[in-house]
Amino acid sequence: MSVRSQALVPLSTEQQAAWRAVAETEKRRHQGNTLAEYPYAGAFFRCLNGSRRISLSDLRFFMPSLTAEELHGNRLQWLYAIDVLIETQGEVCLLPLPGDAAERLFPSVRFRVRERSRHKSALVMQKYSRQQAREAEQKARAYQALVAQAEIELAFHSPETVGSWHARWSDRVAEHDLETLFWQWGERFPSLAGMERWQWQDMPFWQVIAEASLAAREAGHAVREMERWMVPNKLREAA
């Protein structure tokens, strides 16, 4: 396909946003401006729909079926993959992006990379700072460590005391991660048997926590006492 014939094909909204993201980010880089983390990904969504903070809804542009659980622990990998995709103009498409992401934004990529092997992609990837990759990994690991710590602490709570756990972690761990931990933890407590996650999906999480505490109080002394004995000894000894 000639350059002229490619130019005659109108660009879709998302393709225009991708090319604008490349142009704007390269301009800022050449001007010596400080770039934010994952600048190409940020510029793409800003040009596409005005998003200043990339959300789950934004990432569903690439995978409509993406859930909060699937994104859990993988957000940085998604942002990194999108950043690489835009900067390389579709030549490098990393997981977890779907295989058609490159052609969706840069249709001409199939003509540019048809004769290139994965070895070429690896060479392109070498221009990215190893330090940046390490920092991203360290941030991801640090966050996962926080989530793990929150999960461990939750194990030492009963529905009576879960409110204090939420207060401690609500500003340190993402709400969707706290929700996942809570619903998994709550499955073993009789006082919470009547609470189904789907019934509360549109309610603020703090209200779910409040309802859990209320359910424990209304369950009766015998149930509360049993649930206290269901948690590890550390909580009972500290009480």
Curated annotation (Swiss-Prot):
Q: Which Pfam families match?
A: PsiA
Answer whether the UniProt record assigns the keyword Translocase to this protein: no
Keywords associated with the record? Plasmid
Q: What does this protein do, in the record's words?
A: Not yet known.
- Tell me its family: To PsiA protein of plasmid R6-5.
Q: Which NCBIfam families match?
A: PRK13704.1 (NF010258)
Put simply, this protein is called Protein PsiA
Q: Which organism is it from?
A: Escherichia coli (strain K12)
